[in-house]
């Protein structure tokens, strides 16, 4: 496997300094959306880099390759799969890791939860190390973060907090972000950061950086937020 170009970051401390207090933009259009095309993903990536985003989270090997050729900022690469016999969706296979590395990812993120999976999380973490990319653990609990740190995973994220149970919360998990930070982890806040105020609170809670997705790049989702609010207001007005 060829050496990975990490967008000029020689070590994790350099990347941490670069991302400190910054916004990472996740560009993952709604599946089947008119925007769910590589050309549009590349266009959004260029636009948010020009607006000041310091890193991107991109799904899919082909998308990562296309975006990597178009931007200068680091990419957190993932592959999402819907498996028939496992709840693991984010980068479940070593082959996914290899594909993302060759496509130009600086960081490769994976599901670090302790659930039934096709390949062990230890094997995935080691595979990322073998590529020369930095690893990011998408966690749901503090225990996931402890495990990731014990494996030498460089970045821990609150990505999956609230997404592995039956009831999905509506607000971010600031407590988990704070716990990761207080443990000394390179912490990425992610999950339900839908306003600038929430993103700022994540930094105040100890996150190095905040990943924002739906609020910036999923037009259908944001339109629904506005529609729900205006329609509810209209119903209240009519009730009076």
Curated annotation (Swiss-Prot):
Pfam families: NanE. The gene is nanE. Belongs to the NanE family. It comes from Vibrio cholerae serotype O1 (strain ATCC 39315 / El Tor Inaba N16961). One of its GO terms (biological process) is N-acetylmannosamine catabolic process. SUPFAM superfamilies: Ribulose-phoshate binding barrel. It catalyses: an N-acyl-D-glucosamine 6-phosphate = an N-acyl-D-mannosamine 6-phosphate. GO terms for molecular function: N-acylglucosamine-6-phosphate 2-epimerase activity. Its EC number is 5.1.3.9. Pathway: Amino-sugar metabolism; N-acetylneuraminate degradation; D-fructose 6-phosphate from N-acetylneuraminate: step 3/5. InterPro entries: Aldolase_TIM, NanE, RibuloseP-bd_barrel. Keywords: Carbohydrate metabolism, Isomerase. PANTHER family: N-ACETYLMANNOSAMINE-6-PHOSPHATE 2-EPIMERASE-RELATED (PTHR36204:SF1). One of its GO terms (cellular component) is cytosol. This is Putative N-acetylmannosamine-6-phosphate 2-epimerase. Converts N-acetylmannosamine-6-phosphate (ManNAc-6-P) to N-acetylglucosamine-6-phosphate (GlcNAc-6-P).
């Amino acid at each position: 496997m060829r050496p990975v170009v990490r967008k000029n970051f020689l070590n994790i401390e350099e990347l941490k300094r670069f991302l400190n207090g910054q916004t990472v933009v996740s560009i993952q259009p709604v599946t089947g959306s008119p925007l769910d095309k590589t050309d549009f993903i590349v266009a959004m990536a260029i636009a948010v880099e020009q607006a000041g985003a310091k890193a991107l989270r991109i799904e899919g090997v082909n998308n990562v390759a296309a975006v990597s050729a178009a931007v200068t900022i680091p990419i957190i690469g993932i592959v999402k799969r819907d498996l028939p016999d496992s709840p693991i969706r984010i980068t479940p296979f070593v082959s996914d890791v290899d594909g993302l590395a060759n496509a130009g990812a600086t960081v490769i993120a994976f599901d670090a939860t302790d659930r039934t999976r096709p390949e062990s999380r230890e094997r995935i973490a080691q595979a990322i190390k073998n590529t020369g990319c930095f690893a990011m653990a998408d966690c749901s609990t503090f225990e996931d973060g402890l495990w990731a740190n014990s494996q030498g995973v460089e970045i821990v994220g609150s990505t999956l907090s609230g997404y592995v149970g039956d009831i999905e919360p509506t607000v971010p998990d600031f407590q988990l972000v704070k716990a990761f930070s207080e443990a000394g982890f390179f912490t990425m806040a992610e999950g339900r950061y839908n306003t600038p105020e929430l993103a700022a609170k994540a930094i105040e809670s100890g996150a190095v950086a905040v990943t924002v997705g739906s609020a910036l790049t999923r037009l259908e989702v944001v339109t629904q937020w506005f529609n729900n609010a205006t329609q509810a207001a209209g119903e209240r007005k009519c009730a009076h």
